[in-house]
Amino acid sequence: MAILGLGTDIVEIARIEAVIARSGDRLARRVLSDHEWSIWEQHQQPVRFLAKRFAVKEAAAKALGTGIRNGLAFNQFEVYNDELGKPKLRLWGEAKLLAERMGVRAIHVTLADERHYACATVIVES
């Protein structure tokens, strides 16, 4: 196994909160997959949930070497938790095709949040 890419992102939670206050759920609709959306709608801390997903998806796009552009969209990345609560990532559409072309065999995700910030790191391996 070799590291093919590494991405990290930090999000100011108040910034996400301000966007939601200004434009309602538009950002959440753009960022979240259908499954994540269903969780977000019922989450006790929806702003924090969205900030963490945003950070993971930005970090993942950076790890793939492109960022969110060139056909990649936030909803092509889906964050979920395994049975122990560890964050994992599913890829769809162009993100999945790009990962396959790169030879990605494993994706590692870590995320953390504190009062003001959410931070994520994603490593893609062959």
Swiss-Prot record:
An annotated Gene Ontology molecular function: holo-[acyl-carrier-protein] synthase activity
Record flagged with keyword Lipid biosynthesis: yes
Organismal lineage: Bacteria, Pseudomonadati, Pseudomonadota, Gammaproteobacteria, Enterobacterales
Enzyme Commission number, as recorded: 2.7.8.7
Cofactor(s) the record lists: Mg(2+)
Reaction catalyzed: apo-[ACP] + CoA = holo-[ACP] + adenosine 3',5'-bisphosphate + H(+)
Function in brief: Transfers the 4'-phosphopantetheine moiety from coenzyme A to a Ser of acyl-carrier-protein.
Localization annotation: Cytoplasm
InterPro entries membership: 4-PPantetheinyl_Trfase_dom, 4-PPantetheinyl_Trfase_dom_sf, ACPS, Ppantetheine-prot_Trfase_dom
Family indicated by similarity: Belongs to the P-Pant transferase superfamily. AcpS family.
Cell membrane found in the keyword field: no
SUPFAM superfamilies for this protein: 4'-phosphopantetheinyl transferase (SSF56214)
Name of the featured protein: Holo-[acyl-carrier-protein] synthase
Binding sites annotated in the UniProt record for Mg(2+): 9, 58
Any single GO BP term: fatty acid biosynthetic process
